[in-house]
Each structure stands twice: as structure tokens, then as C-alpha cells.
Amino acid sequence: MKIRCLKSDLVKGVSIVSKAVPTKTTMPILECILIDATTDIIKLTANDMELGIETVIRGQIDEKGMIALDARIFSDIVRKLPDNEIVIESGVNLQTLITCEKAKFNISGKSGEDFSYLPYIERENPVSISQFTLKEVIRQTIFSIADNDSNKLMTGELFDMNGDILKVVSLDGHRISIRKIELKESYEPKKIVVPGK
């Protein structure tokens, strides 16, 4: 695999997916970020088996392939590189060379085939809501989610949709936050708990 991209694009992508890298795990592959350049796009993926994040970054693919790199090491290297084009190249022995101007880093990777992929989600009956409104609703309710894992449902927010009303609810056992908004369209009743992480 050999790809080229700007530092700014790579840093942005790495910071997005890093939120799904677990701090403690018994599976070392989950401590990695998957760089997937097997198609015509460059995808970065992280997955802790509860939360998975995938993002696409701009760049050029010189040679297709995929590699999983330790998230902490990769993130530290990328952030310290000069603001220029970064070349990431991995060989058959999974050694990965990261170059930018005169800086060169050689790190060991893991096979991308061993990475746990995100499940494919069928997009049926999507809901339209403005980004601003969604951010505001989350900001106004996220503070009251539970921060311990004693009850998994309380570590997320309930999105309860009924007709043209969306109700977002979070609670931690001591306090509760409820926010109702009116949607532009009417939808079938649905309830889903979205992890607060």
C-alpha cells in the first residue's frame, strides 16, 4: 500500500476516529487505526466493539492495500510532522514507512485483514434534521448521561421519534434531561439509544 495526503487532512481524520480507540483491551488489533486504500478512497477506521467510527480523507492512492497501525504511535507521529504532503507506504512484512519532507518513521503494522470491520447498516427510513439543531439538542442533554458502565442504557441518550416530534432523553440516576423538537416531516415511531461516547 502507498498513499499520499496532506497533513491537515490526515490529522483531522485521525482525530475523528481516535475517539473509538479503546484505552484498555485484550485484543491488540483494536488499539489500531485501519488505513484502508483497497478501493478508490482512503478510509480510516477505529472500533472498540461498542463504538466504531469510519471517515474518508482526501489523498492519492499510488498502490492499493490496507494496514492497521497502533493508534497512539501513529497519531503522535502524524501530529509532529511538518505541514506538507505525507507518504505512507507499507510492504508485505507489514513494516510501514511514514515520510514527510526530511522526516522518516518506520513502524510495525498489523494485517488489515485482522481488523474488526464495522457492520453494514441498511439505511431505511432516514430522518432529516439540521446539523445545528442536532448539535444543540445533544449539547442540552448530554451532561446528564451516566459516566459509569453499571447500566449501559444510562450511558447513552434515548432518541424517541413519534410523528413529527423528536424527544431526546438522558439520565444518570440523579437527574434527567428531556428536549423535544419539532421535525419538518412526520416519521414512523422509533426509539433508539445512542451511546454518549
Language-model regions, residue ranges each:
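Structural preference for solvent-exposed beta-strand-turn elements
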Residues: 1-197
